[in-house]
UniProtKB/Swiss-Prot annotation:
It comes from Bubalus bubalis (Domestic water buffalo). This is Galectin-1. The modification Phosphoserine is found at S30. Lectin that binds beta-galactoside and a wide array of complex carbohydrates. Plays a role in regulating apoptosis, cell proliferation and cell differentiation. Inhibits CD45 protein phosphatase activity and therefore the dephosphorylation of Lyn kinase. Strong inducer of T-cell apoptosis. The modification N-acetylalanine is found at A2. Its main location: secreted. GO terms for cellular component: cytoplasm; extracellular space. Residues 4-135 form the Galectin domain.
Amino acid sequence: MACGLVASNLNLKPGECLRVRGEVAPDAKSFLLNLGKDDNNLCLHFNPRFNAHGDINTIVCNSKDGGAWGAEQREVAFPFQPGSVVEVCISFNQADLTVKLPDGHEFKFPNRLNLEAINYMSAGGDFKIKCVAFD
């Protein structure tokens, strides 16, 4: 899946929140947000799948360490609708990342890379970024 946005040197620290708002395509199959050190070292691969890779209305999360993917974690909460504008907030600490979905539901994903700062973000798929903010 090609990335539509790549940002580096973010220097997001523990406790800070990355807020991403964008528009889901009307015919969306899936989209992704990646956070980490770089493309080969991701503490979070966030991949809502409407109908892709055998998953329907499922959020698939993973990490990548030195280019090797970890074990996938699936979330059943799926507040995304094709054609809608959504906002996702992600914060982290030494132990895990907290993802707050558009409906207010939150889940945690382990900080498997033990990153002390998030410097890289990429986004892609059927999602058009409207705003990125740091809180």
